[in-house]
Amino acid sequence: MATLACAALVVVLAYRWLNRVPSTLTTHPDRAIIALTAQSSDAGFARAEQGRAFVFPRDHAAHPDFRAEWWYFTGHLRDKRDRPFGFQLTLFRFELAAQKTTSPSAWRTPTVLLGHFALSDIAGSKFHAFERLSRALPDVAGTRLTPSAVWLDDWRIEQTNEQNWRLHAAQEGVELDLDLSPASAVVLQGEAGLSRKSAAPGNASYYYSVPRLTAHGHVRLADSDHAVQGQAWLDREWSTSALSREQAGWDWFALQLADGGSLMFYRLRHRDGGSDDYSAGSYSDTSGKQIALKADDVRIEARGTWKSPHSARVYPQGWRIEVPRAKLDLELAPRLPDQEWHGRFQYWEGAVTVTQDGRSAGLGYVELTGY
């Protein structure tokens, strides 16, 4: 579910390149996304309309028959002195047209790559966030089928074998180098991997997660090098449709629980602030047994708010999440208040702690859009 808005943002930026749309559109990206997504025709693209068989590692790689796709990693790391970090590395692929261009110019490719890289330095109370955007060009940006890889210059997400991953991103003195190994099974979200976002036919995605991957590697900040280890979360999603016009945004939660379980839930919000009936998620217990969650299975209560000094947007901060079917009554708190992306598109995405009955119960990531 994470970062659907960022995939839509690619439409705005790429159409500026291809069709010389005035740059003032990105001053109001919420409106621009709606307008320009409509201009980018769905015709010729595959749609997520029914269940499918997932095959790994093939499905870790790109699905160019669909308009949008992303590889999303977040995680929590500690160095040898127990200094904590949170990270996000997400690479998006977006197709502007189903038919390949006949232009002789390589710059007229319909494939666009967008990257978001963030590091939350918890002890230093600093959120580092960077964005990159490029058309798919040889040696610059693109995807590979075998072994699976997606890259944007030197930002790379790639498989080193059928199970393991390597992540690399560096910018302005902030660097992430990680090797990841799965520590949990793949979770197919929604209806065996078909995640419906509304009642409209085809307004859905194929969506799976790997809620727990063991991570080790290095974090570099300016002149300091930190050998780190921890755990990561992978979300993979591809689709052709966007959200419906009635849906203003979402609150997305991905929690790695201390007992070995995991919880993912996204609350789709209407423009009047109400919850959409297509809000959904899943809970996996310590044995790996999965429970599919519907909108009325989860209760979410915001504990407070935080106003961004960058965008003046007001976000909820701190949550109580109740899942009676899983016997969960959790409290979430941001590890840093300011984990807002305030570049071309503003949203809040950051590391959180999880407690239950006053005791530490895990770590997670939260994404908030449409505020």
What are the functions of these language-model segments?
Residues 1-371:
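Structured soluble/peripheral alpha/beta segments that form catalytic or ligand/cofactor-binding pockets
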